[in-house]
A protein has these predicted regions:
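Extracellular/lumenal glycan-associated context and N-glycosylation machinery
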Residues: 1-54
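Acidic, Ser/Thr-rich peripheral helices and adjacent loops at domain boundaries
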Residues: 292-302, 367-381
Length: 381
């Protein structure tokens, strides 16, 4: 049950009869009259449960983007005048979610609520609150109707704007714009006849001896290599890098770097594996053979949040070993916290480097760099 501002106005209107006939009984009768009218109005108000409410499913969006929640409301039995609130959890950023409706019998309408999510993951609707007014507009029946709905918010992947230039650089390194010669990161491709200008070191003397012409080997960039991304979700990843809008969490910046690396590696024909964890492994995904690697990786990263605990690198190294003993490029996406590195990561590195090539990637904080390079006077301190 709810009352409206009209009840207050009706109470104030009681000043007139009290002035005309100043007595306590006059005031009591007026108050009783207002209460009775309000109760009758509430009883005559339609029941919110009679409304038919459905929600159009929402697709996934990236953090920073906006979307719209859309409700379809129909009144099958009688005319309806109500205030409808499409309630979402606070981080969904639901704005202008209160809608006034007036429906005739059998009429329907669509209510749109803009959403501007402020964090990753699955953000859910809390229900639809309907306040149905009586014919006098004094009172209303109110009820919250559960209408399921959610929106999946993926990592931003802001570095995708750098992807075209990085892919162009990759093509240059691959040898599509250069002579195919043997070197680190290449593998045998085919045999062909020698032409002037070829590197004599590429001559296949055994094949040349069996044929009447000089034959050289051609090389191509290695394919089907393994890249393992290991994302640290421990407490050190909860810190923020100063910037616009209050800064960006270190974890989100590491995700962005991992997505860019995965996109480039997949275009190069490499296999991508992903591990995320802290004290325990939170996620483990094998992305080999999948077309849209970045989309799958974003879906996996969406629910990851920093945990108030230190990273157990021995456990994470075991997860890497569980992917197979084939040599791989293992990229550790972790903040370079001296204590955490010394206590947990350094003892594990020899085990990883014994079978894999290891790269440690950390987010650079511009504010710390500016502080380190600044020279203050004694008065400034």
């Amino acid at each position: 049950m709810a009352i409206t501002w009209r009840v207050t106005l009706l109470m104030l209107a009681g000043i007139v009869p009290v002035v005309l006939r100043p007595s306590a009984s006059t005031a009591a009768v007026w108050i009783l009259l207002v209460v009775v009218l309000t109760l009758v109005d509430v009883l005559l108000a339609p029941k919110p449960a009679t409304l038919e409410i459905s929600r159009i499913p929402l697709g996934g969006i990236r953090l920073g983007e906006s979307t719209t929640s859309e409700l379809t409301v129909r009144s099958p039995a009688r005319s309806f005048r109500a205030l409808v609130r499409d309630a979402w959890q606070p981080t969904a950023g639901a704005g202008h979610n209160r809608h006034r409706i007036r429906l005739g019998r059998g009429d329907s309408t669509r209510l749109r609520t803009p959403l501007q999510p402020r964090r990753r993951g699955d953000l859910r609707a809390l229900g639809v609150t309907v306040r149905a007014y009586g014919p006098l507009g004094l009172g209303a029946r109110q009820r919250t109707i559960p209408v399921e709905g959610s929106v999946r918010v993926l990592p931003t992947f802001e570095s995708r704007k750098h992807l075209p230039s990085r892919l162009q650089r990759l093509r240059e390194l691959d040898g599509r714009a250069a002579v195919r010669v043997r070197g680190q990161g290449t593998e045998f491709d085919s045999l062909r006849e020698y032409v002037r200008g070829d590197d004599v070191r590429s001559i296949d003397w055994r094949t040349t001896a069996r044929s009447r012409t000089v034959v050289v080997r051609t090389w191509q960039p290695e394919r089907d290599r393994r890249v393992v991304l290991v994302l640290d979700t421990s407490r050190t990843s909860a810190g923020r890098i100063e910037g616009a809008g209050g800064g960006v969490p270190r974890l989100d910046s590491a995700m962005d770097a991992g997505l860019l690396l995965a996109a480039i590696a997949s275009r190069a024909g490499d296999r991508i594996d992903f591990i995320a964890g802290d004290l325990r492994v939170r996620s483990r995904v094998r992305l080999a053979g999948q077309r849209d690697v970045t989309q799958r990786l974003q879906e996996t990263m969406a629910d990851l949040e920093p945990v108030i605990a230190e990273a157990d690198w021995s456990n994470l190294a075991g997860a890497v070993a569980g992917l197979g003993r084939h040599r791989a490029l293992v990229v550790l996406l972790t903040p370079l916290d001296p204590h955490a590195i010394e206590e947990s990561l350094l003892p594990v590195l020899p085990v990883l480097t014994q079978h894999h090539r290891v790269v440690i990637a950390s987010v650079r904080d511009p504010e710390l760099e500016a502080t380190a390079t600044s020279r203050d006077t004694l008065e400034d301190v």
